[in-house]
Regions:
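Hydrophobic residues in well-ordered beta-strands that form the structural core
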Residues: 88-89, 113-115, 239
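Beta-loop-alpha module in the N-terminal Rossmann-like domain of NAD(P)-dependent dehydrogenases
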Residues: 44-103
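NAD(P)-dinucleotide binding in Rossmann-like oxidoreductases
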Residues: 194-199, 209-272, 278-283
């Protein structure tokens, strides 16, 4: 089968670090062009806006959106209306309603819409889900602590309305949680820490039904922590390295100590969805974030500056 031609929109850090290597490493894909106000990729045709690209490149079959959440709906809608399949970087939108609208539009046009959760593609997530499938969960806890200055250097949009703040990484943990637990949980309470000079939280503590809790923090320097621990009546499971390393009862049980397999797996999944004429839009992780911002008790903390 001929490679699918894709336009990559939003050439920032995540596009350069993850999307471009994944596309260039796959026979399923051809990075046909990019769209970005500033960023470019060497050797690839570049456009400054979506309208110009859509008009000039009718041969592009797929649009992959690595834009921040706020401008993503307009770009996704334009791509779908022009007959292109669409891949959405996480989170899939700034609001739940706009993603539902995109889902309806894709279905109406017979196009594939893939709302991606890259952390679900981590090496140990599937075996963790399989191990937990017949277990009785007694407790689960997420510790997701990283350094915003490392992962979003100078990117003030993450602290603007719609940027999600610490839920930008935290939603990755929630995407794993909602994938591996054998039964659904719902949020019961939350405490959110907002820097006095910012619009979104820099830390969050969440409590769910089923004795499930989470601790998110964007101020951790040095080694980063992306762990999920699950206790059951039959033993303990730990996911480390963002879902890439699995331990059962404290012993290594699979996975790989790298995050570089997630995006190749996303694009492989997208190619299969297009071939099958299907879409994949699961908003469960985003529902938990929306609930946290609805239920959360606000705590003001020190100003934050990059």
């Amino acid at each position: 089968m001929a490679a699918l031609r894709v336009a990559l929109v939003g050439i920032g850090k995540i596009a350069v670090d993850q999307h471009v290597p994944a596309l260039r490493g796959s026979a399923d894909w051809e990075l046909a062009c990019t769209v970005s106000r500033k960023g470019t990729v060497d050797g690839v045709q570049a456009f400054a806006d979506m309208a110009s690209m859509l008009e000039a490149r009718p041969d592009v079959q797929v649009v992959s959106l690595a834009l921040p959440p706020m401008p993503r709906f307009v770009a996704a809608e334009a791509a779908l209306k022009s007959g292109r399949h669409v891949l959405l970087e996480k989170p899939p939108g700034a609001t739940l309603a706009e993603v539902h609208a995109l889902q309806a539009l894709a279905a109406e046009r017979g196009l594939t819409l893939f709302a991606t959760w890259h952390s679900r593609m981590a090496h140990a997530v599937f075996p963790a889900k399989a191990w937990l499938a017949d277990k009785t969960i007694t407790r689960a806890h997420i510790t997701w602590r990283e350094d915003v200055r490392k992962w979003h250097p100078g990117q003030d949009w993450v602290f603007e309305p719609g940027g999600m703040g610490v839920f930008d990484p935290g939603i990755n943990a929630l995407s794993i949680l909602t994938e591996i637990l054998p039964a659904a949980v719902h949020l019961q309470s939350a405490e959110l820490e907002f820097p006095a000079n910012r619009q979104t939280p820099i830390a969050a503590r969440l409590a769910f039904s089923g004795n499930v809790t989470a601790d998110f923090d964007w101020r951790q320097e040095g080694p980063q922590t992306w762990d999920i621990e699950v206790e059951t009546t039959a033993g303990r499971l730990d996911l480390r390295m963002g879902g890439n390393v699995l331990e059962i009862d404290g012993q290594p049980a699979g996975g790989q100590n790298t995050i570089m397999g997630e995006y190749p797996a996303l694009y492989a999944r997208m190619a299969k969805l297009i071939a099958a004429g299907q879409s994949d839009v699961d908003l469960a992780p985003m529902v938990h974030v929306a609930d946290a911002l609805t239920l959360g008790r606000r705590v003001i903390v020190d100003d934050f500056f990059f």
